[in-house]
Design a protein with these regions (language model features):
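PLP-dependent aminotransferase class I/II
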Residues: 1-117
Length: 117
C-alpha cells in the first residue's frame, strides 16, 4: 500500500523530497484527510508536483489531455517531512503516525515497502 519512489540505477538523487506512493483508493482513505490528520499531529506534508498537463497554462493552450500514467502517479504521491537534521525518532514518529492514520501497522513493515529499489 505504501512504497517509496523507485530510483533509477544510473543516477544519484538529490534527496530534496521524501515522496511516498500511497494507494489511497485501495486503503479507502482520501489523501486530503491524511494530510489534515498529519497536520493536526504537527506533521506537514505536501503534494509535489501537479502534472504539467493539469497546469492551467497548458490546459488553456492544449485543452484537456488524458495522461493516465502521470495522473495515476499524482493520485498516489505524498511528500513527507525531510530536513538535514532529521533524527531517527522524527522519522519513526512520521511513519508510525502515517501508518496509524492509514489503518496499517508499521512495526513489522508488512504494509510498507521500505526499499527504494
Amino acid at each position: 500500500y505504501v512504497q517509496p519512489i523507485k530510483l533509477a540505477h544510473n543516477c544519484t538523487p538529490a534527496w530534496h523530497l521524501s515522496v511516498a506512493l500511497i494507494d489511497f483508493d485501495a486503503l479507502g482513505v482520501p489523501r486530503g484527510e491524511v494530510i489534515n490528520k498529519l497536520r493536526l499531529l504537527g506533521i506537514g506534508t505536501q503534494v509535489h508536483y501537479i502534472p504539467v498537463h493539469q497546469q492551467p497554462y497548458y490546459k488553456d493552450r492544449y485543452g484537456i489531455l488524458e495522461l493516465p500514467g502521470a495522473s495515476a502517479y499524482y493520485s498516489k504521491c505524498l511528500s513527507l517531512p525531510l530536513w538535514p537534521a532529521m533524527e531517527s525518532e522524527d522519522v519513526d514518529f512520521v511513519m508510525e503516525s502515517l501508518a496509524k492514520i492509514l489503518g496499517l501497522t508499521f512495526e513489522d513493515n508488512t504494509n510498507f515497502d521500505t526499499k527504494a529499489n
